[in-house]
Amino acid sequence: MLHAKIVDIKEKKISLSDAEKFISSNSYGASIFFTGTVRNQNNNKNVVGITYDSHDALVIKSFQEIYNEAEKKLNIDVKSVFIEHAKGYLNLGEISIVIAVACKHRDKTYLLSRYIIEEIKKRSPIWKKEHYLNNKTSWLKGNPIINEKN
């Protein structure tokens, strides 16, 4: 079971209670919540906020592909996964992503949660523009949408 969504923060904030409700079930003995938040330092620069942009349809597709791949690669057939990523400007400490995972056992839950966040960072077309204390901004280097072959 998968919930995958891009959240426009002008309309709604990411909700941990929504994640908890989605993954709650008597079928699962373990659950994990991963939250990514805006931190105040990156590459020795004082960050005050981040603007996230994304290609929403491709992001959702990548979330679904990652979920489906995980089932095969990690051999986890009974699971519930909730993924939401913010789009728009976030202040320090605000949640940019939540990944909630529930499985029968804790080992698979940890494994699946880690797999999902690492694959999202590698593959999902989500871009970050950092806003600094000195009023400057910078788009961070991301990954290409299409894998280039040499």
Question: What are these language model-derived features?
Answer:
Residues 1-95, 102-114, 118-150:
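N-terminal, polar/charged subdomain of small-to-medium soluble alpha/beta proteins
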